[in-house]
């Protein structure tokens, strides 16, 4: 387990200015927040700090602005947070300088303020010492509650943790604990589901997982690359033929590590890539030249369920097929619901993450039944790849 200080260790917060790095990078439409999931995730940390009499000074980014860009201001996000928190949230139109200092100095014990987008300043992504100093002058201690940005060594995610007494927030703490239970010290057997379209985007992930898990189920477009590498005809299916040798190398590594690989044995195929296209279920040995595999078939789903029955831990990243279109969502939905049911019965610890994965589990209506669903995206993937995350490393005792 990673040793780091949590808010349990931060006992004396009365009247302290607590700089909290949070994830406010939420989807927006016409100046309104359209999904408040990330806002809800930080409420326990804010309430913990304010409940102890601390002044919560929130730091965050929104989008990828190149300098100041009012369309990516955090002002409307602060307003939405106010609604979620059920109390007033102040806002400062800058995150450093006189405006920020003045706004923070006006805070009373137990109050909350959102400072403007840290990425309006180039020093944020450069982890620049002068920018770190300017931020640090606004706080007495630092809390990181944004695991989703922990793979970036930026001023507000890494630099500040080395400048001020640093603690993990509640969301950060639960994310690290869930991932550690799933991969670093898991109950075995561990089964990983890795799907999605391309092997090329998940090479390091696959290479790391074959050393850590007992069973690796490969789905989605990337399964086609493995099937083609094994000599199967994949027709017009999405497939990275140039990675055939790489796919075979991963299979060899898995064999050497004692990791069982599960690939589709049947598929739902169509000649057109569109919702409700005419389709059929066929063996992966019988895909015609004008057909594309768009989902795993029912026999494959049955095999995966059988493997899940014997597993104790599941790590999931990526869908089985083109889940955004019916009927090519069937395998993803069936397996996701099965994992959710086993988890609900206490037979499985299940951790899932990555943008498409979260969307797929929500589509299946089963995200709530998983042990832990990470919204972290890039940081979740890098953790699965076995990489050290700067934002987490900086919190180590």
Swiss-Prot record:
Catalyzed reaction equations: (2R)-3-phosphoglycerate + ATP = (2R)-3-phospho-glyceroyl phosphate + ADP
EC number: 2.7.2.3
The protein's enzyme class: transferase
Gene Ontology process terms (BP): gluconeogenesis; glycolytic process
One term under GO cellular component: cytosol
Gene Ontology MF term list: ADP binding; ATP binding; phosphoglycerate kinase activity
Positions with a binding annotation for substrate: 23-25, 38, 61-64, 119, 152
Keywords per UniProt: ATP-binding, Cytoplasm, Glycolysis, Kinase, Nucleotide-binding, Transferase
Localization per Swiss-Prot or TrEMBL: Cytoplasm
Primary location class: cytoplasm
Residues the entry annotates as binding ATP: 202, 324, 354-357
CDD domains: Phosphoglycerate_kinase
PROSITE patterns: PGLYCERATE_KINASE
InterPro entries xref list: Phosphoglycerate_kinase, Phosphoglycerate_kinase_CS, Phosphoglycerate_kinase_N, Phosphoglycerate_kinase_sf
Protein's pathway: Carbohydrate degradation; glycolysis; pyruvate from D-glyceraldehyde 3-phosphate: step 2/5
Quaternary structure note: Monomer.
Family: Belongs to the phosphoglycerate kinase family.
Protein's recorded name: Phosphoglycerate kinase
């Amino acid at each position: 387990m990673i040793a780091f200080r949590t808010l349990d260790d931060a006992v004396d917060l009365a009247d302290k200015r607590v700089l909290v790095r949070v994830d406010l990078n939420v989807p927006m439409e016409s100046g309104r927040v359209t999904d408040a999931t990330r806002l809800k995730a930080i409420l326990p940390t804010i309430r913990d700090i304010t409940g102890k009499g601390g002044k919560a000074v929130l730091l965050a980014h929104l989008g990828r602005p190149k300098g100041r860009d009012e369309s990516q201001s955090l002002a409307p996000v602060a307003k939405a947070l106010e609604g979620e928190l059920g109390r007033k949230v102040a806002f400062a139109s800058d995150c450093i300088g006189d405006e920020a200092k003045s706004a923070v100095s006006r805070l009373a014990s137990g109050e909350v303020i959102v400072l403007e987008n840290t990425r309006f300043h180039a020093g944020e992504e450069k982890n620049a010492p002068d920018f770190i100093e300017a931020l640090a002058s606004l706080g007495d201690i630092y809390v990181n509650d944004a695991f989703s940005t922990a793979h970036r060594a930026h001023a507000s995610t890494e630099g500040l943790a080395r400048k001020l007494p640093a603690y993990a927030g509640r969301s950060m703490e639960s994310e690290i604990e869930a991932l550690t239970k799933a991969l670093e010290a898991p109950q075995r057997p561990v089964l990983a589901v890795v799907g999605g379209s391309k092997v090329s985007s998940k090479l390091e992930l696959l290479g790391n997982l074959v050393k850590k898990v007992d069973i690796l189920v490969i789905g989605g477009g990337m399964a086609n690359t493995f099937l083609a590498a094994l000599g199967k005809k994949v027709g017009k299916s999405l497939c990275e033929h140039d990675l055939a040798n790489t796919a075979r190398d991963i299979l060899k590594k898995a064999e050497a590590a004692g990791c069982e690989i599960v690939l589709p044995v049947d598929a739902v195929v169509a000649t057109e890539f569109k919702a409700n296209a005419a389709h059929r279920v066929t063996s992966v040995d019988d895909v015609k030249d004008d057909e594309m595999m768009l989902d795993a078939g029912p026999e494959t789903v049955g095999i995966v369920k059988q493997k899940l029955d014997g597993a104790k831990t599941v790590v999931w990243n990526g869908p089985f097929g083109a889940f955004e279109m019916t009927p090519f969502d069937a395998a993803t939905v069936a397996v996701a619901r099965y994992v959710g049911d086993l988890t609900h019965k206490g037979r499985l610890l299940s951790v899932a993450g990555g943008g498409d994965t979260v969307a797929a589990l929500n589509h299946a209506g089963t995200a709530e039944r998983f042990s832990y669903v990470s919204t972290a995206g890039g940081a979740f993937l890098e953790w699965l790849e076995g990489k050290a995350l700067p934002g987490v490393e900086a919190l180590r005792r």
